[in-house]
């Protein structure tokens, strides 16, 4: 497997575009995105667990109940959530796009992201669709820009992999800076592949993958109302269709995880106001469930995230987060170290502090990517979670989000 360019357009038969249609006030910001497959594709998705769900999720879930999709449309700037006519608007978006592409409206995945509780006017979307469709091409970047809200960085990736003797491609784009806390979904992620795989196996692969990828990110502890991860697989690579578990399915799952884990890191690093990516790596867990609980609890701790912003090696906040994680852990066996490109330093062993240089620790924690290495001493299970530091800018961004 090798990393390639192209994002969601790396796979055969997929094109994309993004335009400004007028939902967002800033005319330099794209606010409407499209991904299109030249043939119908197997489709799968996972959705937010928030009881308050955006209308687009309801429409998408109904549309791809048969496991087929051919296009994805997403607007940014308005979440189309808690609106009396939300379902009607999301359904109309599918119809307008279906008419423009000459495909069935129920072959469309629809998504929205932005402010909750404000009416979404269909007119700018209707006016923008002709340019959106007319500009379809190798424009993964434009589509990525079209789904961004408070994101600072574009998030896209693609890989090439051999499956069943054929060269397959898989790529994805994502948005998500705030409201990142699972369980699924925690952001918008759109993945495309030309691998031939049944919708049932595609759903199985995605549902399993999110447990160790997107469900292991936390930016601010809020679970979004709108977000989802969707995958379209159009089969144009020509491999024998994957319909059951086996070597080809395992290879596909590895490729899918390469995409999702890369996007996870990018999302965590681009947390609202973030200056540092935090990666908590837990080893020696009694089982994976306990290891995940520990890793997730640490990256969710506001006190610890604030300490990382200040480059303060306050390992006590790590143990505190482990203690309330709900994991079955023997604290007297816990070890903690901090690592970055500047080096590594142990700060805790056997559940107690060890002597270390505060100056050396600060050098390590001043880097923009920090690893928190935790050993539990209870077994062989491992887990990784991602987050970011908590900065002044997070409050500034969210204090005036609607303006």
What residue ranges belong to the model's regions?
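A structural signal for small-residue-enriched, beta-sheet-centric alpha/beta enzyme cores
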Residues: 1-88, 92, 98-403
């Amino acid at each position: 497997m090798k990393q390639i360019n192209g994002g969601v357009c790396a796979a055969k038969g997929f094109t994309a575009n993004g335009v400004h249609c007028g939902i967002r006030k800033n005319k330099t910001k794209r606010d409407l995105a499209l991904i299109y497959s030249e043939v119908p594709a197997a489709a799968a998705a996972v959705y937010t667990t928030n009881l308050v769900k955006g209308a687009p999720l309801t429409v998408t879930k109904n549309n791809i109940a048969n496991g087929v999709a051919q296009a994805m449309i997403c607007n940014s700037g308005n979440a189309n959530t808690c609106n009396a006519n939300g379902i009607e608007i999301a359904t109309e978006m599918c119809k307008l796009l279906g008419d423009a592409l000459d495909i069935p409206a129920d072959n469309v995945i629809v998504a929205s992201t932005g402010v909750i509780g404000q009416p979404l006017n269909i007119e700018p979307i209707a006016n923008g669709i002709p340019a959106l469709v007319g500009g379809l091409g190798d424009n993964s970047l434009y589509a990525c820009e079209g789904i961004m809200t408070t994101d600072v960085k574009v998030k896209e990736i693609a890989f090439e992999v051999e499956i069943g003797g054929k060269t397959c491609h898989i790529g994805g784009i994502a948005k998500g800076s705030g409201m990142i806390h699972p369980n699924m979904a925690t952001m918008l992620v759109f993945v495309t592949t030309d691998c031939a795989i049944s919708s049932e196996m595609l759903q199985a692969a995605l549902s399993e993958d999110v447990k160790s990828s997107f469900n292991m990110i936390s930016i601010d502890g809020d679970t979004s109302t709108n977000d989802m991860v969707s995958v379209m697989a159009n089969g144009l690579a020509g491999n024998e269709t994957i319909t059951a578990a086996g070597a080809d399915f395992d290879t596909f799952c590895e490729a899918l995880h390469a995409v999702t884990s890369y996007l996870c890191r990018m999302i965590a690093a681009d947390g609202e106001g973030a200056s540092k990516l935090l990666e908590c790596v837990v080893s020696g867990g009694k089982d994976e469930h306990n290891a995940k609980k520990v890793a997730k609890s640490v990256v969710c701790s506001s006190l610890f995230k604030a300490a990382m912003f200040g480059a303060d090696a306050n390992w006590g906040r790590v143990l505190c987060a482990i203690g309330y994680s709900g994991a079955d852990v023997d604290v007297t066996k816990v070890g903690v170290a901090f690592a970055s490109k500047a080096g590594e330093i142990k700060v805790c062993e056997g559940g107690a502090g060890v002597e270390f240089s505060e100056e050396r620790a600060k050098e390590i924690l001043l880097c923009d990517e920090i690893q928190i290495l935790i050993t539990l001493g209870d077994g062989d299970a491992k887990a990784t979670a991602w987050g970011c530091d908590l900065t002044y800018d997070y409050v500034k961004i969210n204090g005036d989000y609607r303006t």
